[in-house]
């Protein structure tokens, strides 16, 4: 609960995620403001450094990777029509994207970090290379991250550190797949940097060394808790 978090000396901001379930930002440092649509919190790191941290959770259906892999889900059909899949997935998440971009463009600081479970791959992942390697069934410019990129949020931390989706697919979905499930990178850290910042690392946290950069100790008790792997991103201020 928020009170339990605050009892540990931490700060927490929770928002309604455009009415699609609560999201929270937890910080060791105090907040100095909240964005108009509540997606972000300004965090005062001291010494005159203030950053904007935003968090979101994309609508979980339609789920485009299922559609394009022959899996019907939530009344959305399996199909090989990429344009249709892009259209319905954009319609499902564009309301969230618009509010995120409103908050982003209202920022009073150049450093902005947006993290979340987007329930959609990055537009940098389903490439010609990924198609040739058998990691994606089609080439797709997924609309949520593409729209955010066009709106000015041009950094994808994992792809900054690991630009090749073939050698480093970075799958965060899912550590407990069924035989028919897909593997996808749904959990992202997007960003814009101030002049004195850089991305130092971005690592997947999960159940084993095969699928994760950081193995969570004693994963067993969490097997039925986490359906996504985590992501740890480190930014450096120089």
Predicted regions and their residues:
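Surface-exposed cleft-lining segments at the edges of enzyme active sites
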Residues: 77-94, 131-133
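Active-site surface patch of divalent metal-dependent phosphodiester/phosphate bond hydrolases
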Residues: 1-37, 47, 144-154
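Beta-strand-turn-beta hairpins that frame and shape the catalytic cleft
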Residues: 28-31, 40-79, 196, 235-238
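Glycine-rich, phosphate-binding/catalytic loops in enzymes
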Residues: 4-10, 70-72, 129-133, 207
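Stable alpha-helical elements in mature extracytoplasmic
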Residues: 1, 22, 92-100, 140-144
